[in-house]
């Protein structure tokens, strides 16, 4: 299979990242959405279709009902998921899937039936020659050049902390909360409403997401930042809306991501904070590996892209960790693509050749082969 270029596909709840093994960045990055017209007359015209995928669905979302086949990291709608994969191969990457080995990523604690369904669709619908399925966090760690550490991965639909030892995740110590990018966008809209700006439709929430991504930051000392924002306008920034109107954003810039660190205080949700999630995962591991985990905390995913998040997480974990341990948080500049890049690197290695589930393996054993080959 060495002459066939591997396709690496990282399916996130919010965004698909797809490309070819050995390359530094994905060729295609597009929303993991399927859009269908709210009513048939809304899209009369030459280009009207019964459904739209990815960027096209995003552009037309004002007149579409938007569906996310992946919710909180787990595939919920297989028909739509198949459409997303079809779009990935034929439109975005422009490849014939039966000519390329495929690496797919999965969320930690992905149900066994889901792993089998992914495997079945790849071999039976797309007729791929070979497949490998790997946990996203393992690839994040891999792209950071390590095989032991703990990954705090916050995407669009779910946040996970995954301890990994010598390249294998430690399933009983994996933690997750359904608090991630989409929740922060909704929370930001709520904060902006308090300021007198109303954003409610799905198209308007896209504007809020852009505000969140461009202007938010994590305060190292939240209370003192809050006091400063009351006493001065130093945190205020202007944002121009698509219609040309300019709005001013102030303390919302750091109050929004504070939700990750104080879910109960900020928005009344009784969830673990990301620092508690990370700490609990480490404490669930064998005492002998904890030091290695504390010294190699990797943050990845789009929701970790706000400035200051690494420093704040470090401070919070240092407050909880044994004083004798030198805690280290690693936040690479392009961590939004860490999972994809880890997959690109890993499948490029000659040692990976024996890892694949081949078509022969599948024909002989069925979809359950994924549990034996992809541990």
From Swiss-Prot:
It is an enzyme of class 3 (hydrolase). GO terms for molecular function: ATP binding; hydrolase activity. SMART domains: ACTIN. The keyword Transmembrane helix does not apply. PROSITE patterns: ACTINS_1, ACTINS_2, ACTINS_ACT_LIKE. Its EC number is 3.6.4.-. It catalyses: ATP + H2O = ADP + phosphate + H(+). This is Actin, cytoplasmic. It is found in: Cytoplasm, Cytoskeleton. Belongs to the actin family. PANTHER family: ACTIN.
């Amino acid at each position: 299979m060495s002459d066939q270029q591997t396709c690496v596909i990282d399916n996130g709840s919010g965004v698909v990242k797809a490309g070819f093994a050995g390359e530094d960045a994905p060729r295609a990055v597009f929303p993991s959405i399927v859009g269908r017209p709210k009513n048939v007359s809304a899209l009369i015209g030459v280009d009207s279709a019964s459904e739209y995928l990815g960027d096209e669905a995003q552009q037309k979302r004002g007149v579409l009902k938007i569906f996310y086949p992946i919710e909180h990291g787990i595939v919920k709608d297989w028909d739509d998921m198949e459409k997303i994969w079809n779009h990935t191969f034929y439109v975005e990457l422009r490849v014939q899937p039966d000519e390329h080995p495929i690496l797919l990523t999965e969320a930690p604690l992905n149900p066994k039936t889901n792993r089998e369904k992914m495997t079945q669709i790849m071999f039976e619908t797309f007729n791929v020659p070979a497949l490998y399925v790997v946990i996203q966090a393992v690839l994040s760690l891999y792209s950071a050049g390590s095989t032991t550490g703990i990954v705090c991965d916050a995407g669009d639909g779910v946040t996970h902390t995954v301890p990994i030892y010598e390249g294998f995740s430690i399933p009983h110590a994996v933690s997750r909360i359904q608090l991630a990018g989409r929740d922060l966008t909704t929370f930001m809209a709520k904060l902006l409403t308090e300021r007198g700006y109303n954003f409610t439709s799905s198209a308007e929430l896209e504007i809020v997401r852009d505000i969140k991504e461009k202007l938010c930051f994590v305060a190292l000392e939240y209370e003192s930042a809050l006091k400063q924002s009351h006493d001065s306008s130093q945190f205020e920034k202007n944002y121009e809306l698509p219609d040309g109107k300019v709005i001013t954003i102030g303390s919302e810039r750091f109050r929004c991501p504070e939700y990750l660190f104080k879910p109960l205080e900020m928005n009344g949700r009784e969830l673990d904070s990301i620092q508690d999630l990370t700490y609990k995962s480490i404490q669930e591991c064998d005492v002998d590996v904890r030091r290695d985990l504390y010294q190699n905390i990797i943050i990845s995913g789009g929701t970790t892209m706000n400035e200051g998040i690494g420093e704040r997480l470090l401070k919070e974990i240092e407050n909880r960790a044994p004083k004798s341990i030198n805690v280290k948080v690693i936040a690479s500049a392009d961590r939004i693509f860490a999972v994809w890049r880890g997959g690109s690197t890993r499948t490029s290695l000659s040692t990976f050749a024996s890892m694949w589930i081949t078509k022969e393996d599948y024909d002989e054993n069925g979809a359950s082969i994924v549990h034996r080959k992809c541990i």
